[in-house]
Amino acid sequence: MTKDYQDFQHLDNDNDHHQLRRGPPPTPRLLQRLCSGSRLLLLSSSLSILLLVVVCVITSQNSQLREDLLALRQNFSNLTVSTEDQVKALSTQGSSVGRKMKLVESKLEKQQKDLTEDHSSLLLHVKQLVSDVRSLSCQMAAFRGNGSERTCCPINWVEYEGSCYWFSSSVRPWTEADKYCQLENAHLVVVTSRDEQNFLQRHMGPLNTWIGLTDQNGPWKWVDGTDYETGFQNWRPEQPDNWYGHGLGGGEDCAHFTTDGRWNDDVCRRPYRWVCETKLDKAN
């Protein structure tokens, strides 16, 4: 009996020792903490997974956005190239159209100029025709009156203030031009007023033209005897100068109209146009 009691006591001691080794049983608060930690771990894992999913989605969308951006850049580049090509083509077409317009404008201007010249020429022909008809009528009247009185200029001569003028279309030296006028019962033109000067300029144009003024025999004289010193003069500045530097020998002894209408002395051998003049009552 005592042995059994000792064995039982020993067994109880072993159980107590085993319990001491294992520690005290877990309390409810500890279990709650363990459960709470598991939940936190699970929540953290879930959040990590969710975050990973979000990152994957964002990465996928970012990749798609990059592809879209590259596509947009390519489309923009293609559009830019296409636009530049179209602009160049339009510029080329515009330049071509501009050249064609300038060509058309040039042609129109030339045609207008030709028409103006033709119109002016036609008017001159009409005026000349009227003058010729008038001269012919005048000559017929003079013929019927046995030529006792002249009331108009010969054909191709121009009447002005009681004188008749003939304008050459060829050129001759001063002496030959003067002889030609004498054969027409006239003389080289003698300019006696500003009005006559203007009349002559309108008919001559801007051409060098001999007039009946010379100093070959001394002082300047008009061929018809008109007084030079007290009469009308229209020399260019510093003229006459009797210049010897022309290399043609001698000085300058004959006067002529210059291109602006003023007078200049020159070598008489130069070939210029000329104007003949005669009084209306002396015209043939």
UniProtKB/Swiss-Prot annotation:
Keyword set includes Endoplasmic reticulum: no
Motif Endocytosis signal, chain ranges: 5-8
Coiled coil: 59-117
ATP-binding as UniProt keyword: no
Binding-site positions, Ca(2+) 3: Q239, D241, E252, N264, D265
Glycosylation sites: N75, N78, N146
Gene3D superfamilies: Mannose-Binding Protein A, subunit A (3.10.100.10)
Annotated S-S bridges: C153-C164, C181-C276, C254-C268
Membrane-spanning ranges: 40-60
Tissue: Expressed exclusively in hepatic parenchymal cells.
Membrane topology of the entry: Single-pass type II membrane protein
Function: Mediates the endocytosis of plasma glycoproteins to which the terminal sialic acid residue on their complex carbohydrate moieties has been removed. The receptor recognizes terminal galactose and N-acetylgalactosamine units. After ligand binding to the receptor, the resulting complex is internalized and transported to a sorting organelle, where receptor and ligand are disassociated. The receptor then returns to the cell membrane surface.
Extra remark beyond the main annotation: Calcium is required for ligand binding.
Subunit structure: Interacts with LASS2.
The name this protein goes by in its record: Asialoglycoprotein receptor 1
Species of the source: Mus musculus
Gene: Asgr1
